[in-house]
């Protein structure tokens, strides 16, 4: 029997029987040539090619022993680059466990083990990680304490304010791991891995007793130290809370003197402060914003305001020491607290204060005095305003609506809202402000004399870059070209780091969220430059040609996408710092994953192990969306779906969907005119969606959904819809294209494997050895005919429906819990809640309409389409009719369409009479009697369903038809039903 091809290429999924063959093949993707000629500049992929070159060109014979072997070379798709090394050398990993990549001195861990290690005096030349693996425990403990004290002193000197203002400093990942390693040793010799005294020695018992006594004393000492540290942390925390309350009281007095604010802002400021502090992991600039604000409030004296009244009005400005930028930041924090506390009217009031202060006072004031430091302060305020506006989707609120419930305000504040000016703002406006102003300021700071200023505030520009890249869909941020050559990680610029991903995946720090966000943002902008047709009409032609791409061509871009996914989507459940409930769900998912791998053919193991993971953060979903974008390069699909889902006018929805149908029929679904490349990217996006669709009821498994905002939920809905359309196109290719070699395509094989409930159907077709696998002898062989087409299509329908219902419920929960509620604390209805609730209602209705119409159109397209199935039903083949139906009935696709219509029986239907007429005419001209009869039966069923829905669910005859949402509001997303041949046969 031929050897199984279990070694899979990381870029094209081509299979090989030997690992060195796979390694050489992957070099053709990465253009890696590790064998260099010593006589010239030539390099080669294989060693024998170098030997032939030297023999024929230079007339010399190389000694084979001096050349590296294929096994000695590092495989860049298996062994990652370690960013902690300045030289970027590769580091080996063991069976999916990632090595700690950030030692205290920035050096690698030495993985070599020595049975008799000697204590070296050259401690300065080795890292702390090396010391801990070589020295006894007592020496380790004594050598690490001074280092920890020194690092803490350095942190206190660098951040003196943080020790007093309640902003905890996050220790490095290496510090946490090293502290954890101290508690894992049970004896002084456990780190050595050997016994210092032979077991047969007479002194062994004495030594063992001494070791046990020493261990007990050490454990007691560690417990005492741990208790002391806990008490110290609790004492500092109490001090920080008291200090934070004191500066909040000072802020209240400051705002009363500044603009006569008489609202109690203590609770809202604390709520907003804590929220921003929690978000500092994703946007690290928040930590500095809070630190500077607390420092200002801590050092500002209230008596300065009292002394102001002692001077005439002409001199008050010189003695008025209030920092307007910090006032704007304070307004933002207070507005954020009111939003989280379900008081949107109050939040908008303070948001408008901060916006008007920035736009009408601070920016014009900078234009007059031209203070360079004010530019950075402007960006701080504008970034925080933009974050709040987008995160809480304030575009759905009527920000200029006058409040008529004056009694809902506190005494003395009823007329304050009328004095505020109108604010004309939406998502596009605030993004344009941040995009333009950040580019202008960064361009001003690029001068040689002020270049240090932009480098010292580079973290601010990286955070702006992340935010703009996520929400601007058509083009990269204007600061993209400026930041390409700025240092991102140690000595790596953004360009150099991204180019490393085209040749190897990188061992990234699991806690460095900002680095991952920047990498995803850079990849997003690169794809915008490659695939977006729309460019700035005012941009000169010469500058368009000078746009700098990170990757030279699309093949290199494809390699980078594959390796970035492998670097960021790496998942190690044992290293995740999660709570017990989430850890239980993650362990359960790991069991499901291992069960799938163990029971699958060996040649599928590598693909399943690499690509099945849980998207735990929104940037994981962003990366999957970008991976899908490379497959579907037609961005018109994305724009059309976004327009249909976000419109608020019913007539526009119908009109847009008609255009969308034409786009699908004439362009997208025609794989011959618009082909797609079936490669590993298809598996990267499909595995998580298909596998997780069965476990969506495990609430703790998808905790990232609770942290998303409404705009992110919209993008996620579009991603699932676009993936579903891609799967429909792939389904057509598999069943129609005779050039597809399914028996040698591991991508399509594994896709069918995880879809089918009865895996034996696929194994029987591929003639795979099933001696070690669960196998059903009586199963039907998978065939590319009508019946199996509808079986797989219904399976995709079920997965799509589960995900859409799951996202709908999650979006409703997030909106109701984190943004606004029906009533305020005073009992008065929040008027802005109606706007937000109406927006969510329109979105849910649009999604429901779109799902139903899409499913209806696709079923009609597959029945009336001109594509032919690769295989026809063979009446003489017993495998195709074992326990099913006879050829005379042939209602396979009819049953499938009826079942598909039943899935969405509660959805509104889009009536299009002209399409039904064409549909009937096509049936009259079809020579196949069985198809014509079956289609007519299904059409009557559709018509009955349409009349039932229109009578029961629609209210009114206007374009703003409102669906009776209560009928399917509580429908839970269910596990994918088993759509097997037996079930399909029973329905006939």
Swiss-Prot record:
Region of interest: Disordered: 59-129, 174-229
Subcellular compartments: Nucleus
Entry GO CC: chromatin; nucleus
SUPFAM superfamilies per the UniProt record, alphabetical: beta-beta-alpha zinc fingers (SSF57667)
GO molecular function: DNA-binding transcription factor activity, RNA polymerase II-specific; RNA polymerase II cis-regulatory region sequence-specific DNA binding; zinc ion binding
Keyword match Cell membrane: no
KW Transcription (keyword) present: yes
Zinc finger residue ranges, C2H2-type: 7-29, 35-59
GO biological process: cell adhesion; positive regulation of cell adhesion involved in single-species biofilm formation; positive regulation of cell-substrate adhesion; regulation of transcription by RNA polymerase II; single-species biofilm formation on inanimate substrate
Listed Polar residues bias regions: 59-83, 113-129, 174-208
Protein name: Transcriptional regulator of yeast form adherence 5
């Amino acid at each position: 029997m031929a050897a199984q091809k279990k070694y899979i290429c990381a870029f094209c999924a081509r299979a090989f029987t030997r690992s060195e063959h796979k390694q050489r093949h992957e070099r053709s993707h990465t253009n890696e040539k590790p064998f260099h000629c010593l006589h010239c500049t030539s390099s080669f992929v294989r060693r024998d090619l170098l030997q032939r070159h030297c023999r024929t060109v230079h007339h010399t014979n190389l000694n084979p022993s001096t050349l590296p072997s294929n096994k000695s070379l590092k495989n860049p798709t298996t062994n990652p680059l370690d960013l902690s090394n300045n030289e970027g050398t590769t580091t080996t990993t063991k069976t999916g466990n990632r090595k700690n990549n950030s030692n205290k001195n920035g050096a690698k861990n030495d993985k070599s083990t020595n049975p008799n290690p000697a204590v070296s005096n050259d401690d300065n030349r080795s890292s702390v990680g090396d010391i801990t693996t070589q020295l006894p425990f007592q020496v380790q403990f004594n050598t690490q304490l001074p280092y920890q004290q020194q690092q803490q002193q350095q942190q206190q000197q660098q951040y003196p304010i943080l020790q007093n203002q309640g902003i905890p400093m996050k220790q490095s990942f290496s510090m946490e791991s090293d502290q954890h390693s101290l508690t894992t040793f049970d004896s002084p010799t456990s780190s050595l891995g050997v016994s210092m005294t032979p077991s047969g020695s007479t002194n062994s018992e004495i030594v063992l007793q001494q070791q046990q006594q020493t261990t007990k004393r050490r454990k007691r000492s560690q417990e005492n130290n741990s208790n002391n540290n806990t008490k110290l942390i609790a004492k500092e925390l109490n001090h920080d809370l008291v200090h934070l309350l004191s500066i909040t009281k000072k802020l209240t007095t400051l705002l009363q003197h500044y603009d006569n604010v008489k609202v109690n802002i203590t609770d809202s400021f604390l709520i907003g402060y804590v929220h921003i502090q929690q978000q500092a992991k994703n946007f690290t600039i928040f930590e500095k914003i809070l630190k500077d604000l607390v420092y200002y409030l801590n050092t500002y004296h209230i008596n300065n305001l009292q002394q102001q009244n002692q001077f005439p009005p002409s001199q008050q400005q010189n003695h008025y020491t209030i920092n307007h930028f910090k006032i704007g930041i304070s307004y933002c924090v207070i507005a954020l607290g009111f939003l989280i506390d379900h008081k949107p009217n109050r939040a908008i009031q303070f948001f408008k204060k901060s916006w008007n202060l920035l736009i009408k006072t601070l920016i014009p004031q900078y234009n007059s005095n031209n203070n360079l430091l004010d530019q950075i302060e402007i960006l701080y305020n504008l970034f925080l305003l933009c974050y709040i506006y987008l995160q809480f989707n304030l575009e759905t609120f009527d920000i200029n609506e006058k409040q008529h419930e004056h009694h809902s305000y506190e005494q003395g504040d009823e007329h304050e809202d009328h004095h505020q000016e109108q604010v004309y703002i939406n998502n596009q406006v605030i993004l344009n402000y941040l995009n333009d102003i950040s580019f202008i300021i960064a361009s001003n700071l690029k001068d040689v004399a002020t270049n240090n200023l932009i480098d010292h505030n580079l973290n601010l520009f990286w955070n702006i870059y992340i935010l703009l890249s996520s929400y601007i869909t058509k083009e990269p941020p204007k600061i993209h070209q400026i930041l390409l050559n700025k240092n991102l990680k140690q000595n790596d610029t953004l360009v150099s780091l991204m180019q490393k991903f085209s040749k190897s995946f990188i061992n990234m720090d699991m806690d460095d969220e900002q680095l991952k966000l920047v990498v995803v943002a850079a990849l997003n902008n690169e794809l915008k430059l490659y695939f977006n047709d729309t460019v700035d009409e005012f941009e000169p032609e010469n500058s368009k040609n000078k746009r700098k791409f990170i990757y030279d061509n699309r093949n290199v871009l494809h390699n980078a996408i594959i390796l970035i996914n492998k670097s960021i989507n790496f998942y190690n459940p044992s290293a995740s710092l999660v709570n017990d409930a989430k850890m239980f769900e993650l362990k359960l998912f790991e069991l499901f994953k291992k069960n799938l791998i163990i029971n699958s053919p060996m040649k599928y193991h590598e693909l399943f192990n690499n690509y099945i993971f849980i998207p735990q953060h929104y940037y994981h979903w962003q990366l999957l969306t970008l991976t899908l974008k490379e497959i579907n390069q037609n961005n018109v699909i994305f724009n059309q779906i976004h327009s249909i889902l976000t419109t608020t006018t019913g007539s526009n929805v119908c009109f847009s969907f008609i255009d969308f149908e034409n786009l699908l029929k004439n362009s997208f679904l025609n794989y011959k005119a618009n082909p797609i490349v079936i490669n590993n990217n298809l598996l990267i996006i499909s595995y998580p969606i298909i596998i997780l669709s069965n476990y969506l009821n495990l609430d703790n498994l998808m905790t990232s959904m609770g942290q998303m905002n409404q705009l992110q939920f919209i993008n996620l809905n579009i991603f699932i819809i676009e993936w579903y359309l891609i799967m429909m196109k792939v389904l057509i290719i598999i069943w129609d294209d005779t050039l597809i070699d399914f028996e040698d395509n591991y991508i399509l094989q594994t896709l069918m494997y995880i879809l089918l409930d009865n895996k034996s159907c696929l194994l029987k077709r591929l003639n795979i050895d099933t001696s070690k696998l669960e196998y059903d002898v009586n199963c039907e062989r998978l065939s590319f005919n009508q019946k199996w087409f509808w079986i797989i299509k219904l399976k995709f329908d079920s997965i799509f429906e589960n995900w859409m219902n799951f996202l709908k419920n999650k979006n409703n929960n997030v909106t109701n819990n984190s943004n606004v509620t029906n009533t305020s604390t005073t009992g008065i209805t929040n008027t802005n809640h109606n706007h937000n609730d109406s927006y969510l209602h329109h979105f849910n209705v649009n999604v429901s309409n779109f799902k139903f119409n899409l499913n209806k159109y696709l079923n009609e397209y597959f029945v009336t389409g001109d594509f032919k199935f690769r295989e026809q039903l063979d009446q003489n083949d017993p495998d195709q009719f074992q326990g099913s139906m006879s050829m005379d009935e042939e209602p396979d696709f009819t049953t499938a369409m009826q079942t598909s219509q039943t899935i969405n029986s509660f959805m509104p239907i889009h009536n299009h009479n002209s399409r039904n007429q064409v549909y009937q005419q096509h049936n009259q001209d079809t020579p196949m009697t069985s198809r014509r009869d079956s289609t007519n039966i299904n059409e009557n069923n559709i018509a009955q369903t349409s009349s039932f829905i229109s009578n029961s669910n629609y209210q009114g005859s206007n374009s703003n038809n409102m669906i009776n949402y209560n009928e399917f509001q509580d429908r839970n997303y269910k596990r994918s039903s088993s759509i097997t041949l037996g079930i399909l046969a029973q329905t006939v």
